[in-house]
Amino acid sequence: MKINLILLDSSLELVPKEIASHPAVIRNARKRNKKPEHTILDISLHYHAMKNLPNWRKRGRPDIVHLALLMFLTEKVPIKGEVYIHTIDGKIIYVNSDMRPPKNYNRFIGLAEQLLLHGQVPINDANPLMKILNIKLTDLKSKYKIGVLSEDGKKVKPEELCNLGENWLLGVGAFPHGDFSEEIKGVADEYFSISNYKLETHQVICRIISACLQQLGWP
């Protein structure tokens, strides 16, 4: 039993050039001794600047990605398959399933900035923890069926997802507001819902992991 996971439309991106000269962005960058466009977009720091961006309510939440990776990767469990991040601007990031994400948020942000600037972390390592792949989301369709977790999807019990098979890639949205992009809608083979209530990204992952481990007889 392996669960392949992809975080979809993830709110993980560098500060776009359109707002790089905004005082809020410059102030944060100076504190960290970095160029504004080399810092991660974060709505808690860049709220006033972001209001000028298209689709801004769906952007600037790298903490969602951080929590999701912590939930899926921290424990040494036998169900971890392939892990990917699909970003809101269409990048596909491969995540080594042996990675132990830093629990400290600021350390994670540093890693994410390095990743988005240089294409992988660590830089020039033959076995990177995370790497931007030169592919599109549609390219993953040749390897997987894609099942998207959505509150409007087909009602299933979490344990049913554990038994789909390793040719399935489970997609969980990693953004705060809004709907999946047309890119996601174009590749989804099936939509699943595991609750009658709206769940946050890390809650969805937690429920699936717990259900799968229970099937395996883990305490």
Curated annotation (Swiss-Prot):
The record marks 63 as: Stabilizes Arg-61. The keyword rRNA-binding applies. GO terms for biological process: rRNA base methylation. It holds the Pfam family EMG1. It is an enzyme of class 2 (transferase). InterPro entries: Alpha/beta_knot_MTases, Rbsml_bgen_MeTrfase_EMG1/NEP1, Ribosome_NEP1_arc, tRNA_m1G_MTases_N. The record marks 61, 100, 103, 107 as: Interaction with substrate rRNA. CDD domains: Nep1-like. Homodimer. This is Ribosomal RNA small subunit methyltransferase Nep1.
